[in-house]
Regions:
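N-terminal secretory signal peptides that target proteins for export/translocation
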Residues: 1-20
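Alpha-helical solenoid repeat scaffolds
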Residues: 39-206, 212-716
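Bacterial N-terminal signal peptides
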Residues: 23-34
């Protein structure tokens, strides 16, 4: 199809989504039917580690409560809908995730929070059900409202309805005693034909019921031909993999039938119980007819009028994303329509993404040409201009003129909030002395669920750069979000801050344990052994030492007890860690104590472990010098020091050589260099194979009678 000079997407265009998204194309078939389904395009494919900063210049698996180029496009759509149809109060459900905190969220968690649990439970028959609880409950309500039904009829019909659409129905010779009961039974048999793919039988069955005495049966029978047409249209439109092959493969006759059925139903029941659904299915028909202009305009209208805090809004976002925005040529198509500013907003934000490998594709000239389309949305257009300028790193003064200060409002729509956060980000980039004051004022009207933590992130990022770091953890601090505080405790916090945080009974246990764990680990790792021996007394007697460190970022329990009751040694005998640390405090070159510290790391899961590592620039939370001074020493560093000491006792040098070689077993990559290093740093720090061979040879030749020479058979 062409619109003007723009060649629009082919019907079989690739459904490849934005990075970190995946698609199950089979969902598109069910979606085309108007059935409850989800096209799985998860913003956080697997584990999501967000970029802890306000800006998201490229796609980020973690969404923010502001319109942003880096957001999943569906998150931006919901935020836009909520801006146009704001709720009377903040009704976001808390979707706290330890890794994302309350500052970020995924599309999955956002959409799931909109799914309302039914007040009544429904037991579905076993099988591959094509129906949901809503259909069962609607049928049950219709039975209850039908006065002419006997109790036996109601019970039997309800039993049969639970089977229809799930498996072969056990009719069992059931016959309804009343006329309404016979109408409901005929309805169930027509529905069974529908779910079984007998389109002709279903049409005949429902057609015979459009004049039923039961108003529910009559209206539903007139509505169901829409569903029959849509399902028949795609029933055979599958490719070699069993996926939906695209609208151009749909059955045109069935699509036309569905279109006619919509007109017929809305003429008979313009305000009927299914009127909203029927009007929504006009979009499906337009899509299957490849009438993309009509489809896009219908989507635009839905964006403008649908409340953004419902499950239907999430379904609409999925539909727009999968059937329009992610199709080839969609951006140019939307721009050339000339009158779909809301769709254009979402497309523009996506086109503003940039990275080191890919430049932003939306130019200032293109955005200027679009101005007339936004005549009814001045604030939105101003935000787009400011966002593009910010992404292009243009002069802060230009951006600030587009975003007047409104930080003292009592409440913000997502768009209004986005404008103010972008203003704060621009103040930060300009090193404006009033930045912190701006963030503090913006806190007042921010919604507590996701907006306030984002503002706190802005304030904390500002305060971490100067003498105000301690204010973040002071009593009465406006920075209350535990995730933000925990990350700063692992990075910028000084020993004094860590000690105070570990003792603060007003804070959550996990935050206190993060503070104490960070303090003790860094003291060992940075060589502050005397301080470690003193602060070890802060570890509670019942502290956990069994949880491990594999999921430190999001595990509920922090194993602070590892430092007081961990494993001290195996074949190489070592004293408790407090005694090892005391020995190192007296003499940092105590070779036995150094080896025992290495064994503590090895035996308690510290190989590959790291505290939070901030991003590389000042706009990342945690960026800056480590709050605990000193160079970090990892296991291999300790072994190298012992090996370099030719005067060290033979048994200690032999063990150091053995452990240094074993660091590279069996992969050839060292486990002993600290996970905080990236691959190039690891490669630079790793011992070349020639050195590993030299360690192996020295152990075998200089200490042939040692246990460690006898145990070691290879080098890697």
């Amino acid at each position: 199809m062409t619109t003007g000079n723009t060649v629009y997407m082919s019907a079989k265009a690739s459904l490849l989504r934005t990075p970190a998204k995946t698609v199950l194309l089979a969902g598109a078939m069910l979606s085309a039917l108007g059935l409850a389904t989800s096209v799985w395009a998860s913003g956080d494919s697997g584990y999501c580690a967000p970029d802890w900063r306000l800006s998201a210049p490229s796609y980020d698996c973690a969404g923010r409560a502001m319109l942003s180029p880096g957001n999943d496009t569906r998150i931006n759509m919901l935020l836009l809908m909520r801006s146009l149809r704001p709720a009377s109060e903040d009704n976001d459900r808390d979707t706290y995730d330890t890794a994302l905190g309350r500052t970020f969220f995924s599309w999955d968690s956002m959409s799931a929070s909109l799914q309302r649990r039914p007040e009544r439970k429904v037991e579905l028959a076993l099988g591959n059900c094509q129906i949901g609880a809503e259909g069962i409950l609607a049928f049950r309500d219709a039975l209850a409202a039908e006065k002419g039904l006997s109790a036996a009829d109601r019970s039997g019909l309800d039993r049969l309805r639970a089977q229809v659409g799930c498996r072969a129905v056990e009719w069992g010779g059931f016959t309804a005693a009343s006329a309404p009961g016979r109408e409901f039974l005929a309805y169930l048999k027509a529905a069974d034909a529908f779910y079984g793919g007998d389109w002709a039988g279903a049409r005949a069955g429902f057609s015979a019921l459009t004049g039923a005495r039961s108003r529910w049966v009559a209206e539903t029978a007139r509505y169901m031909p829409i569903r029959i047409g849509l399902r028949a249209a795609v029933a055979e439109a599958v490719d070699q993999y069993g996926d939906f092959a695209g609208p151009d493969k749909a059955n045109d006759e069935a699509v036309t039938s569905a279109h006619e059925a919509i007109d017929d139903y809305l003429k008979a029941y313009p305000n009927g119980r299914y009127a909203t659904s029927a009007k929504g299915l006009i979009r499906r028909v337009a899509w299957l007819e490849n009438d993309q202009a009509t489809f896009a305009h219908l989507l635009e209208n839905e964006l403008a009028t649908r409340p953004g805090n419902t499950a239907a809004a999430a379904a609409l976002a999925n539909e727009i994303d999968g059937k329009l925005l992610e199709q080839d040529g969609a951006d140019a198509f939307i721009a050339n329509l000339g009158n779909t500013p809301l769709l254009l907003t979402i497309s523009n934000l996506k086109r503003m993404r940039s990275s080191s490998n890919e430049a932003m594709t939306l130019s200032a000239d293109e955005l200027a040409v679009q101005k007339n389309q936004f005549s009814a949305y001045g604030d939105l257009y101003g935000f787009l201009l400011a966002t593009r300028s910010f992404q292009a790193q243009e002069q802060p003064a230009t951006i600030l003129r587009l975003l007047p200060d409104a930080a003292r409002e009592s409440r913000y729509t997502p768009l209004a909030f986005s404008r103010q956060v972008l203003r704060g980000m621009t103040l930060s980039r300009a090193s404006d002395p009033n930045e912190a004051g701006f963030w503090r004022e913006l806190l007042g009207g921010s919604s507590p669920t996701f907006q306030r933590p984002l503002v706190e992130l802005g304030l904390a990022t500002r305060w971490q750069r100067g003498p105000k770091l301690s204010d973040i953890f002071a009593p009465g601090s406006p920075v209350t979000d535990t995730s933000t505080r925990e990350l700063l405790l692992q990075t910028r916090a000084t020993p004094a801050i860590l000690r105070a945080a570990a003792r603060d009974p007003s804070r959550p246990l996990r935050e206190r344990d993060i503070a104490l764990f960070s303090l003790l680990f860094k003291q060992l790792n940075h060589g502050a052994y005397a301080d470690f021996t003193k602060d070890l007394a802060l570890v509670p007697t019942d502290a956990d030492n069994r949880t491990g460190l594999w999921s430190f970022a999001d595990q509920a329990t922090i194993p602070v007890g590892l430092f007081s009751k961990g494993t001290w040694g195996d074949e190489f005998v070592c004293p408790s860690l407090d005694r090892t640390a005391a020995a190192l405090a007296r003499n940092p070159r105590d070779r036995k104590a150094q080896l025992c510290l290495g064994d503590f790391y090895r035996l308690n899961g510290f190989d590959g472990f790291r505290l939070f590592r901030p991003g590389p620039t000042a706009d990342y939370l945690g960026y800056g010098p480590d709050g605990v001074p000193g160079r970090a020493l990892y296991r291999e560093d300790l072994y190298n020091e012992v090996i370099a000491d030719r005067s060290a006792p033979a048994d200690l040098r032999a063990y150091a050589l053995y452990r240094a070689v074993m660091c590279y077993a069996p992969s050839g990559y060292s486990d002993c260099l600290g996970a905080a290093r990236n691959d190039p740093e690891n490669d630079a720090a790793a011992a070349p194979q020639s050195r590993r061979k030299a360690w192996f040879t020295e152990l075998k030749q200089r200490y042939p009678d040692s246990q460690w020479a006898k145990d070691l058979r290879y080098y890697w």
